[in-house]
Regions:
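Internal, well-ordered domain-core segments that constitute the primary functional module
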Residues: 1-17
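Residues that flank catalytic or metal-binding motifs in active/ligand-binding sites
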Residues: 8-12, 54, 186, 234
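A broad, low-specificity signal marking well-ordered, structured residues that form hydrophobic/aromatic
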Residues: 14, 70, 188, 201, ...
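Residues in well-ordered beta-strands of folded domains
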Residues: 15-17, 30, 204, 239
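C-terminal structured domain segments
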Residues: 177-224
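Outer-membrane beta-barrel "beta-signal"
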Residues: 225-242
Length: 242
């Protein structure tokens, strides 16, 4: 189900963070209400009303060993925010196409140092949206599941190698018709950094494959304008912070 365009909103956010639980564990609880406040251009473009949205989350953070961490997140999305979980949209944005619905997401991610020079990172995601109705009249449900893992070897404090793998599977029902797509990504990268943390300069090669033949949007049909189901990418990526 479509998840754009985004519209302006006024927001109220409540957050209680870093509540200690047991050794190395903290809990955060948050709620955000988004009041639709579309500008003139957005109102003209849509020619319909907009509904407010709301999101809530619970985050359990667990420290593992000295430098490892694991995060478990449960999220709820209501009304205009109903599709944000399945589209990996930000909780502070409001989807102007949604009239009704609700969604939820369960996510787990973290990094564990398994040896002096080896780290393993992971991310598990499942999200669903139910009883969704769009302003264009479409009705249905959607879900997404994904898993990814990254193994890092530190050759020194200034250089490291990454091996990353990921897989996703999306499903949706629109007006009684079922659709699905899936895909995978594999990446090998070599990074130079100032110390073991970012910033870093990364040279990478990635292979993507995806099966989107049974999907609704022809513009999203795999690669090379829909002619191929896989592709390669080579590039340079910089991660910096101040």
């Amino acid at each position: 189900m479509a998840a754009s365009p985004l519209i302006d909103s006024n927001q109220l956010e409540l957050m209680y963070d870093s509540q200690p639980l047991w050794d190395g564990a903290t809990l955060a609880v948050g709620y955000k209400y988004l009041h639709a406040d579309a500008n003139d251009e957005q109102v003209e473009r849509a020619n319909h009303d907009y509904v407010d949205g709301q999101t809530a989350m619970v985050v359990l953070k667990q420290q593992i060993f000295d430098k490892g961490v694991n995060n478990t997140v449960i999220q709820y999305y209501g009304k205009g925010s109903a599709l944000q979980g399945v589209t990996f949209g930000a909780a502070d944005t409001l989807n102007g196409t949604v009239k009704e619905g609700e969604g939820w997401a369960l996510r787990n991610y973290g990094t564990i140092p398994v040896a002096a020079d080896w780290d393993v990172s992971h991310a598990l995601n499942y999200a669903a949206a139910n009883d969704v109705e769009l302003w264009n009249g479409d009705k249905g449900d959607a879900s997404t599941a994904s898993v990814s893992a990254k193994v890092t070897y530190h050759w020194s404090d200034y250089t490291r190698t990454y091996l990353e793998m990921g897989y996703f599977d999306d499903k949706k029902t629109v007006n009684g018709t079922d659709y699905d797509r899936s895909g995978a990504k594999y990446t090998l990268a070599q990074a130079l950094s100032y110390g073991r943390d970012k910033p870093e300069l990364r040279v990478f090669v990635s292979h993507y494959d995806s099966d989107r033949d049974n999907w609704t949007d022809a513009s999203e049909s795999s690669f090379n304008n829909g002619l191929d189901n896989d592709t390669w990418a080579v590039g340079i990526q910089a991660n910096v912070f101040w």
